[in-house]
């Protein structure tokens, strides 16, 4: 079973969304701007997503 968490900010002026996916099985974090949204997202401000990514990296997660 996939153990992933999806996070997204609001849509920016270009129509893109800053998003992050945390893969707990492989200890990987993916981030970036995307036009399309992933499923089951938790919405939060971009700054908060960046802080969350840093916390995961401190716990040994890799950023790809």
Question: Where do the language-model regions lie?
Answer:
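Short intrinsically disordered terminal tails
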Residues: 1-2, 58-64
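Acidic, low-complexity, intrinsically disordered interaction modules
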Residues: 5, 9-55
